[in-house]
């Protein structure tokens, strides 16, 4: 089997859709020797901010000299990004080796049990657990939940800590229709007295979190109550009890990144007793270099991409544009997948600049004829970039929406730059 054949096999499981539940995962992992039981790992859940928080933690612990695994989704350029070691994506050789071990087990699942076929995400999660727990053991892993928490495929290990940067309305068909219902699903990963670090401004979400923490014997750490972050992404001060980190500068702009980084700092301090090389000075140095591709990322001096893929993340993007780029004329290009609340997202975006919509090559991308007619349209992002993006720094060009869309934009723009 070649690497491409392995990749095609993984993606071929996409047809089995999304199936919440852990029975298939538990069976496959048992057949592989339960590698997840060997893991020392932190679980990151939430609606937005998971990837940035994972990236901050990865940068801190890698810079401290530990062997660090990360599991994130979706990928921005290359599928192998989803399983990374010390900030570098898994090699083709290692992924091929994992698939050769896992594929026979996956194929036995529907034949030897009453379970249906495994989904694509379940298989990728099994590959990750096998890699970090058995094939290439790590000192610590930072694992991002795929969707929700309680019934998510990742929820089969005992976490050192659980982090939740935000709760918003997304994937309601699966997770619930209210913030409280979604919060209950997310915090469902909390177990075994692991500390729970979170940020929220909603009483209903806080109540759900605190109730679950009491049930699990977990201590909670809430941003703004137990630890604070005062300032902006250019410079903020972090305080927890008598511990203070002053003048922290982030590589990523935006007030939401201050919150994400603060959760990562809090977790790092709590884990310090088992990972003593993580010092306050190292944390500050690491955060100054922790970039996350596809999130408020500048591909050119005046061209930003940002994967604002739901109402909450669109609001965060708008706050950033209004606070950091108020002196610019803003032009926006947007594309999404058809499970997102595009009317609300578009209504927000049109308030900050000249808005155009497009479609992209993805199975459930929103087609042009499905957008409200009031918005300008272009057939594809390449056309928009060629027609709109100039070297005039009076304007800021922002491409946003689905992370799948952003990944295609990023790849193409960087390829054009390399051809010059």
Regions from the language model: what does each represent?
Residues 57, 128, 209:
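Aromatic/hydrophobic pocket-lining residues that form π-stacking "cages" and hydrophobic walls in ligand
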């Amino acid at each position: 089997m070649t690497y491409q054949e392995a990749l095609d096999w993984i993606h071929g499981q996409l047809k089995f859709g999304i199936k919440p539940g852990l029975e298939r995962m538990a069976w496959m992992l048992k057949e592989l020797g339960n590698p997840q039981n060997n893991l020392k790992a932190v679980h990151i859940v939430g609606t937005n901010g998971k990837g940035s928080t994972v990236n901050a933690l990865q940068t801190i612990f890698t810079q401290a000299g530990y062997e660090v695994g990360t599991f994130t989704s979706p990928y921005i350029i290359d599928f192998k990004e989803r399983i990374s070691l010390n900030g570098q994506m898994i090699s083709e050789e290692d992924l091929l080796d994992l698939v050769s071990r896992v594929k026979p087990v996956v194929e036995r699942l529907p034949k030897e049990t009453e379970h249906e076929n495994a989904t694509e995400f379940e298989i990728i999660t099994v590959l990750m657990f096998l890699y970090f727990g058995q094939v290439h053991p790590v000192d610590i892993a930072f694992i991002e939940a795929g969707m929700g928490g309680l019934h998510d495929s990742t929820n089969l290990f005992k976490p050192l800590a659980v982090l939740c940067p935000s709760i918003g309305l997304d994937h309601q068909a699966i997770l619930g229709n209210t913030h409280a219902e979604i919060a209950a699903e997310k915090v469902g990963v909390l177990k075994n007295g692991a500390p729970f670090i979170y940020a929220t401004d909603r009483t209903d979400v806080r109540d759900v979190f605190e109730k679950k923490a009491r049930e699990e014997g977990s201590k909670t750490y809430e941003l703004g109550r137990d630890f604070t972050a005062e300032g902006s992404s250019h410079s903020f001060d972090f305080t927890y009890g008598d511990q203070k980190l002053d003048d922290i500068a982030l590589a990523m702009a935006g007030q939401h990144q201050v919150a994400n980084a603060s959760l990562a700092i809090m977790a790092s301090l709590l884990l310090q007793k088992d990972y003593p090389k993580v010092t306050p000075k190292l944390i500050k140095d690491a955060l100054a270099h922790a970039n996350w591709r596809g999130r408020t990322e500048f591909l050119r001096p005046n061209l930003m991409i940002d994967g604002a893929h739901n109402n909450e993340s669109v609001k965060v993007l708008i706050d950033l544009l209004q606070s950091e780029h108020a002196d610019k004329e803003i032009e926006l290009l947007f594309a999404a997948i058809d499970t997102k609340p595009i009317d609300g997202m578009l209504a927000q975006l049109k308030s900050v600049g000249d808005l155009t919509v497009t479609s992209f090559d993805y199975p459930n991308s929103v087609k042009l004829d499905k957008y409200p007619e009031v918005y300008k349209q272009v057939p594809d992002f390449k056309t928009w970039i060629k027609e709109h993006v100039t070297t005039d720094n009076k304007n800021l060009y922002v491409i946003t929406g689905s992370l799948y869309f952003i990944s295609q934009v990023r790849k193409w723009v960087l390829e054009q730059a390399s051809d010059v």
